[in-house]
Amino acid sequence: MSGKPAARQGDMTQYGGSIVQGSAGVRIGAPTGVACSVCPGGVTSGHPVNPLLGAKVLPGETDIALPGPLPFILSRTYSSYRTKTPAPVGSLGPGWKMPADIRLQLRDNTLILSDNGGRSLYFEHLFPGEDGYSRSESLWLVRGGVAKLDEGHRLAALWQALPEELRLSPHRYLATNSPQGPWWLLGWCERVPEADEVLPAPLPPYRVLTGLVDRFGRTQTFHREAAGEFSGEITGVTDGAWRHFRLVLTTQAQRAEEARQQAISGGTEPSAFPDTLPGYTEYGRDNGIRLSAVWLTHDPEYPENLPAAPLVRYGWTPRGELAVVYDRSGKQVRSFTYDDKYRGRMVAHRHTGRPEIRYRYDSDGRVTEQLNPAGLSYTYQYEKDRITITDSLDRREVLHTQGEAGLKRVVKKEHADGSVTQSQFDAVGRLRAQTDAAGRTTEYSPDVVTGLITRITTPDGRASAFYYNHHNQLTSATGPDGLELRREYDELGRLIQETAPDGDITRYRYDNPHSDLPCATEDATGSRKTMTWSRYGQLLSFTDCSGYVTRYDHDRFGQMTAVHREEGLSQYRAYDSRGQLIAVKDTQGHETRYEYNIAGDLTAVIAPDGSRNGTQYDAWGKAVRTTQGGLTRSMEYDAAGRVIRLTSENGSHTTFRYDVLDRLIQETGFDGRTQRYHHDLTGKLIRSEDEGLVTHWHYDEADRLTHRTVKGETAERWQYDERGWLTDISHISEGHRVAVHYRYDEKGRLTGERQTVHHPQTEALLWQHETRHAYNAQGLANRCIPDSLPAVEWLTYGSGYLAGMKLGDTPLVEYTRDRLHRETLRSFGRYELTTAYTPAGQLQSQHLNSLLSDRDYTWNDNGELIRISSPRQTRSYSYSTTGRLTGVHTTAANLDIRIPYATDPAGNRLPDPELHPDSTLSMWPDNRIARDAHYLYRYDRHGRLTEKTDLIPEGVIRTDDERTHRYHYDSQHRLVHYTRTQYEEPLVESRYLYDPLGRRVAKRVWRRERDLTGWMSLSRKPQVTWYGWDGDRLTTIQNDRTRIQTIYQPGSFTPLIRVETATGELAKTQRRSLADALQQSGGEDGGSVVFPPVLVQMLDRLESEILADRVSEESRRWLASCGLTVEQMQNQMDPVYTPARKIHLYHCDHRGLPLALISKEGTTEWCAEYDEWGNLLNEENPHQLQQLIRLPGQQYDEESGLYYNRHRYYDPLQGRYITQDPIGLKGGWNFYQYPLNPVTNTDPLGLEVFPRPFPLPIPWPKSPAQQQADDNAAKALTKWWNDTASQRIFDSLILNNPGLALDITMIASRGNVADTGITDRVNDIINDRFWSDGKKPDRCDVLQELIDCGDISAKDAKSTQKAWNCRHSRQSNDKKR
């Protein structure tokens, strides 16, 4: 089989006539272009060996790569594999290849293409203008001789990019692996004929690479010598940017003479260095010519500034083998050793500064052993269709193969843990399916011709589809959720438009027909950004949507040397001769320097003030010790390179253990806390143990988490819709069912998040909070509808830069920005905040039209904030060499005080040495602070603070009046119960509820008070506070008196607007939805009716349209089909009440800590002062406003004195958390630590450093006429629903609203609605039984009981059972089937 077009021009027909038109897309015959072996860089092991070939391989090491179109990239590839039809040895010696070594051998009926991996690809003979396509290698080989290819050919456009003389020459061959190119030109070297030869000289029986041509007609040319000792060899290259490189070649005799001269000049005995080499090796014929160096000899951009040294140099063994490589700085970077017996067979290699890796071979030339003196070693055992790999940890992997030569594939893999994975391939070696260790299969559908994946089907049956144009470019991709990515291209194959799955469109513009670099882009907002490029494809300037320009400078090697931004900001970078970054300097001249070892590892960072941070590495370049400011951390690794031990600054250890597949199975922390992990066959975590606390993790077929059990009880549950989007998460918190519900639009964007809390016994809804999001036509999330508030709309310009904010229709905040889009002025009524920046871009000042609140900032050379000055006081900060805050010096009119902060090496707070000079405490090895100047602390085995007791100073008589704080946690280490006692009597008690995401949703506090008998005891009724969230930001706090809602600055945890509404006012806003109103009064005799969920959704949509005064035509047509009008429906809606609200602006410091609340009149109605750790120092609150926000992400709890910080609780007195970090080491080595420089750093999530009772609704009274209208509307809608069930899926309303989730089951049931009479009877029984025995029966069980007793006929209950999706009905149907 040839792989040629099914019908080719020139083929003869049965009756003798030739075919004049052929099909370029359909191919016939046996595969052509099949390689002699698999790709050397395909399946590899260790450092690296290809076990399928048994070959030592180095897939690619790049020595030269300057930027530009069609750049000259000199990369080396090594393989000890030996093909039976080798090309001659190249200029890098036996076993080595570079891209220029591609060669085509012309034989009688076969073409043999030798690639740069040392392989041979076999093609059938080609006639002029004919092509062969290797489906296994996705490679075309085309013979010249025609001006045009068939119009339907995938390479037709690329063919026309070639010069006409190349296209028309039948003696030239061209190869490419993409319809976008480039072409590899295979020609011959024009040599000078000998004197006795007949002219012209005959063409050789091979073709060599003479150049490249891309689809824009740009060329790279390889210059080969026409005569002399280097005839036919490449001695020069001109790249696509017209840079010229000179390749210095040497013969074996020249190298031998050079070796002798070096020995003589060095006074040593010359080593044996023969003048000639054998003419043949296992890797092909060898002429002994080698590449010695490569020079850059012409650079159009830097004609007078050429490098004074070669870009790369090579050294050679006496046998002509590549021995060493020197980079452009002259430093040796690589060395190689070869077998004494077999020339070119590599037995060892090393990177400079790294250990030497050695190899052993069997008699067939296959690698049997890989020896690593500082890591894993491997042995290889070869059998028929089976390779066994065993490492030095005695872990074994077995590869089972099928196929031969280039079609050899691994079809089964036995892993070290005994698990097995399998793969299936088609006839040309393309992957068709993979079966994981659990037996689940993922299927792949490659295009028959191109091999491009057109479909992926996962084990759960969900599929992704991919579509391509005729040039093999992706035009569309549809995910399992049905969302689609689309791309469009111009005639040159350049991307001109991309439509993201969410509908955002990005467009690309080009002004140069010979370049693939865009000159402009246009985003979904319509904002246009322009770019200019150098001839080498480097970005020179970027102009944003406002016309502001950023400029870039580069050196001759393509490295960025400077960035110049608007407002005078610049950054400069310097590099050493090896191209390593050695210095970065800002506009003010502050310079950070970098140092490296011989292997290129970064060993030191020197700050502008000269302080030094150092890192030491092991033999393989893994950091083993870091030192900063005299403090050291160290890391240890096993032979597999896995971290096995960490040693903190305190000398404490954390240790790790792994399974045979390198998965973490045990972690023992600095404090001895041990956590264990168990994985299933596919690597998913299925069980975790935390000091006896056992958690099981459960997944569905799509590997999505479905539920978790802790100590045998169900914890969280996750639910997904048919598109795979998360819709609900629920769990039980302190007996309450707490859930989070999500809604999306048809583009997959989040449109709503609702938190609900239900009563433990009655399941009554206690709390509900919803935040909705809306997107403008450009896709920006510019509208947020907080719970019970008007919409918050963010006003933007350009690509989304913030310009202002509105609440409902009322503009509240305006912003002015500079040429870097930084805020310079913020206006809120009469309030104006002016912000200025230093030349280095740091915050310089924030000035108000109220002078007392002005703040000026001073920074040191290291970028640390060292002073904040205001009219009232000045605070100066001092830091350790590690960047930790060590002291605050505050000066004011009548104040001069310095507060020191002392920590142990790991960052744990220590007693102040000035106040406690007798303290001998120097560190807390386990990071658990057991005592300080005021308290004693106790922890449980999970590292959670469980008790804090007043410290009785020595010498003080104990009176048992110390206060004790006790903390209790749930299985997720969340604080759920707090008590404070004195004299063994409770002073305060609180309990906390959380949603499944760990966000606190409720707080109940009991305080000590005097009862009717005069005794002091805890109150019987708690003070209840509810919390509502928008993502990770706490937006709502509500108690029995007031609701406070916070609007944050977009993308931050800095509060912007505070809205307070009295609970009494809030109650007046409670109204039924249109659907509820119709259901409650739409039944027979004024009773209620139950609408199907889809109808409720449609009514909700209609109601939102009516409230926004934007009723769609689809909704109007739907109402008309029901015999209703918009006006009628509007009359059924409860009126909307607008409550009285207090609105304030938060005036915050540079971190986001509120300093003042400003009214719209510009008056300060609350202000406060804090220390650097967030402790309140003083407060002015004449209006009795409740302001509980502290440092970003923190909420003050009065009962405990702690700050709730999203994932944990923060103790401001200690400046640290009371529990360990949920994300472990990712958040830092000290699991309790808050940022040790709180002056500028924050932790709003309680995870890691950022370098910053609900009242029941009151029904609105209605007139009898309105009540009658409600009844009629409800009946009309119910009738419409039942009458149109069979056609509803095709209804224009649904078709035009793809985001509306249809209940297909309900549609199929054709109007199975629960009988209201039966429903009422069931509910009565449930309520009676609940109150009598405390257990709530299932409604399906009650209904079946009524049927069994004969109280209700099965026929009458059938509709209700179906509507409830009752399991008894399902079981009955199953029996019938």
Swiss-Prot record:
Give a yes or no for keyword Repeat in this entry: yes
Q: Provide the species name.
A: Escherichia coli (strain K12)
Q: What does this protein do?
A: Rhs elements have a nonessential function. They may play an important role in the natural ecology of the cell.
Domain comment as written in the entry: Each rhs appears to consist of a highly conserved 141 kDa amino fragment followed by a highly divergent C-terminus.
sequence repeat coordinates: 330-352, 353-374, 375-417, 418-438, 439-460, 461-481, 482-502, 503-525, 526-546, 547-567, 568-588, 589-609, 610-629, 630-650, 651-671, 672-691, 692-711, 712-734, 735-758, 808-828, 829-850, 851-871, 872-894, 895-930, 931-959, 960-984, 985-1019, 1162-1186
Supply the name of the protein: Protein RhsA
Write out the similarity annotation.
Belongs to the RHS family.
Q: Return the annotated region ranges for 28 X approximate tandem repeats.
A: 330-1186
Alphabetic keyword roster: Repeat
NCBIfam families registered for this protein in UniProt: Rhs_assc_core, RHS_core, YD_repeat_2x
Which residue ranges does the record annotate as region Disordered? 1356-1377
The region annotated as signal peptide is none
* A matching Pfam family: DUF6531
The record's listing under InterPro entries reads:
DUF6531, Ntox34, RHS, Rhs_assc_core, RHS_domain, RHS_repeat, T6SS_VgrG/RHS, YD
